[in-house]
Amino acid sequence: MPSGTSQCEDGSAGGFQHLDMHSEKRQLEKGPSGDKDRVWIRPDTPSRCTWQLGRAMADSPHYHTVLTKSPKILPDILRKIGNTPMVRINKISKNAGLKCELLAKCEFFNAGGSVKDRISLRMIEDAERAGNLKPGDTIIEPTSGNTGIGLALAAAVKGYRCIIVMPEKMSMEKVDVLRALGAEIVRTPTNARFDSPESHVGVAWRLKNEIPNSHILDQYRNASNPLAHYDDTAEEILQQCDGKLDMLVASAGTGGTITGIARKLKEKCPGCKIIGVDPEGSILAEPEELNQTEQTAYEVEGIGYDFIPTVLDRAVVDKWFKSNDEDSFAFARMLIAQEGLLCGGSSGSAMAVAVKAARELQEGQRCVVILPDSVRNYMSKFLSDKWMLQKGFMKEELSVKRPWWWRLRVQELSLSAPLTVLPTVTCEDTIAILREKGFDQAPVVNESGAILGMVTLGNMLSSLLAGKVRPSDEVCKVLYKQFKPIHLTDTLGTLSHILEMDHFALVVHEQIQSRDQAWSGVVGGPTDCSNGMSSKQQMVFGVVTAIDLLNFVAAREQTQT
């Protein structure tokens, strides 16, 4: 059935990959040279799933669940997972000029606030049923946050210890909810590749190898992920639509949601077109040409990856669309303001694509959109006008009265040449240099001057005190990459918004370099390119703080009086 099913070596259909201990040992990988002690399983291992369209349910190797009605009094909050409402989208559909009926499956009505509650409960209960997860054990999971919340919720009810490993990009609201549920949280660098030991996947596996009786339920490979949607979510959709739908639109992260739903719809409603949504900067979409972009980072959380998760079956997706941050957040805000649906950013991604894809549908046809999570996790992000302005996703109202300096350019500031640090300098030496020069932070650049990240005194000292690095370690191990770049042509008003949230902003300019002369963002070596192609590199011009802005305003006001 759904992807992630292991195929035993004798050819018979096996169980879940993460629960098949013999299979897991076969798949364990040693790290590359220089990292020989690392033991882990890749989240993009080729799927050995035996699902085929038209195959009888009786031939499935899996345990399957059947939809049941909710009792009047729930035994615990875990029974409030599933049976989410289907809601008609009225204003957005009308404004987009759609002829078809547009419906939203509102997954933020699950107990933990997202579609990931379904797979979290299913993975735990399947592991318990198989005898692999026992009282007193520890659950570890690398996640963008929502799966972590679902697991922490179930762990709180069932009494398991829960450790969640998530990238720094993810919102503080998610961190606060996880802490409230009793989970332990480990943050990892957002820009770390998935196969890096520093990534959320790599750190989770290191913890598993260190903590006795711990388990990575592994949403990227676990068949319980798409099975939860094959057995439940898809059946709910079919029941709510009386078996009649012509298009389904869903975003993809691990791919479990779209895979599980699509497989069931291919069986029960073969005429339904499956539309996949993948953010620009991710590589999940097909054909591969769709993924070609210079963009590598995006703000929408919970969707897209730099690898193809095992559970994602791209063969059941009829067409992929790429989404972008600006449209995603605009449509998420529209869903809230016009439809009253308190959803998150990835819901906006799905809806932005839906209004494009559904234009081909006619009157009497129906399109269903999956809205994955709630706005609760993003109160300080896209729900905030300041955040949207700072990120460039909103334009300021020209009619709003602003200070005299608001629309002046950053180039008006008298910025001195910045202190920069090479990635090979030690933490100990960097701290000494910063203290000697009286700086709190400095850009870290490679040999060609391209920005790799920032290093701050606070970040280095906290990492040293926590034992994450040693004084003799290179400063590249404590890079801070969530800095806010700003250009000389940006306004001081834009700078002001950034400084309301951060202690500094990095003033950058772009320089075109020949790739056979440039150094890569990977510290320590030149780019392996000989085709003479050119690329844009961000070069540091200066570092600006709130004090710099205040001094400029005060000095100008003195000269004007």
Swiss-Prot record:
Allosterically activated by S-adenosyl-methionine/AdoMet. Activated by S-adenosylhomocysteine/AdoHcy. Binds non-covalently to a heme group that may control the redox sensitivity of the enzyme. GO terms for biological process: blood vessel diameter maintenance; blood vessel remodeling; cartilage development involved in endochondral bone morphogenesis; cellular response to hypoxia; cerebellum morphogenesis; cysteine biosynthetic process; cysteine biosynthetic process from serine; cysteine biosynthetic process via cystathionine. It is found in: Cytoplasm; Nucleus. CDD domains: CBS_like, CBS_pair_CBS. The modification Phosphoserine is found at S196. Keywords: Amino-acid biosynthesis, CBS domain, Cysteine biosynthesis, Cytoplasm, Heme, Iron, Isopeptide bond, Lyase, Metal-binding, Nucleus, Phosphoprotein, Pyridoxal phosphate, Ubl conjugation. GO terms for molecular function: carbon monoxide binding; cystathionine beta-synthase activity; heme binding; metal ion binding; modified amino acid binding; nitric oxide binding; nitrite reductase (NO-forming) activity; oxygen binding. The modification N6-(pyridoxal phosphate)lysine is found at K116. It catalyses: L-homocysteine + L-serine = L,L-cystathionine + H2O. There is a cross-link at K208 (Glycyl lysine isopeptide (Lys-Gly) (interchain with G-Cter in SUMO)). Pyridoxal 5'-phosphate binds at N146, G253, T254, G255, G256, T257, S346. It holds the Pfam family PALP. Hydro-lyase catalyzing the first step of the transsulfuration pathway, where the hydroxyl group of L-serine is displaced by L-homocysteine in a beta-replacement reaction to form L-cystathionine, the precursor of L-cysteine. This catabolic route allows the elimination of L-methionine and the toxic metabolite L-homocysteine. Also involved in the production of hydrogen sulfide, a gasotransmitter with signaling and cytoprotective effects on neurons. This is Cystathionine beta-synthase. The lineage of its organism: Eukaryota, Metazoa, Chordata, Craniata, Vertebrata.
